[in-house]
Amino acid sequence: MVHTIGFIKPDYPGERRVALLPKDIKELENNIAIESGFGREMGISDAAYLKAGAKVMNRKEIFQNCDFIFSLKLLQSNDYQYLRRGQTIIGWTHPYGSGRSFYENECIPRDIKIVDLDNITPRLFYRDRVYDLDYIPRNFVYQNSVIAGFSSTYHALMAYGLMPTSRTKVAILSAGNVAQGAYKAIAHFNSRIRMFYRKTMNEFYATIDEYDVIINGIQVDEPHVNIISKEQLALVKKGCLIIDAAAHQGRAIYGTKFTYLEAPIAQTEGVDYYCLSNSPSLFFRTASKEISKAFTRYIYRPSVDKMMAYLKKEGHPYE
């Protein structure tokens, strides 16, 4: 049986990325339906998607006719009315983070499955079980993470009104994709940069009061464990800007919440921070091309039955 994946425009504040481009709609094992205006941010008409073989529907029709719904970012409350029992929602759904309430309160009662396209460990969530989609390789969309580090750093500096110099001391936490993007951005200013890893974090903590800018690229796995705790925030240099390029609200840095384009800088414990969860959208043209290419290869092209087959496995508990 050939299934249809219905793509809706993300209704998340400031989100401009387009997760599927017409040029990538080829040799797919699933049918494609898009919400009218899906490609507008990229200047792509509905006609271009029709020519590529997709169907075009309005938002309500997508939910009514498609058992598999793709939303790049977490569904917002105005879409809950359209959800149908037994559907599957695919995207950056974050059931262990910002999407926990959505999964537990909206999906589980409706028997809705969730596919979280985490770059490191993509997973399928169903009721009280979690299944690692191990046919999707780690870092399958790493370029979006690099863009996240780059865009977060530039945007945060501009929003804060800070142009670093050769005297600016910068700490970058992690050496992963996000941190690489952050390094690429901050290195343009010839600042004094130190990079720290999980094994060298004690060195960072010993010098935390020296930095003018701290950029975090670490995702926190353990609940109730912060990379920078409340006590450590008290040691941070006055006027220091913390950029959470990993955008792990409340987890990486104590007390943080997501910030938004209209107000990208906030404070926790008197320290200014940046925590925009969709910063790659600032470079949406570049990010859209990378996302569409990677997601087509691993998500859109194989039959969605490949994901659903994991339900026959044991999985592990949702916690």
Where are these regions (language model features)?
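Rossmann-like adenosine-cofactor binding region
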Residues: K199-D272
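Adenosine-phosphate binding glycine-rich loop
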Residues: D118-M163, R251-E319
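N-terminal beta-loop-helix "entrance" segment that forms/cooperates
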Residues: A33-K55
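Short glycine-/small-residue-rich Rossmann-like dinucleotide-binding loops
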Residues: K73-L74, T93-H94, I218-E222, A246-A247, ...
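Glycine-rich phosphate/diphosphate-binding loop of Rossmann-like nucleotide-binding domains
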Residues: P10-R40, I147-Q219
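Short acidic-hydrophobic, aromatic-tinged amphipathic segments that line or gate anion-handling sites
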Residues: K55-E61
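Phosphate/diphosphate ligand-binding glycine-rich loop within oxidoreductases
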Residues: F63-Q64, F68-A148
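A short helix->loop->beta-strand "cap" motif at the edges of active sites that frequently abuts
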Residues: N30, R84-T88, P109-I112, K237-C240, ...
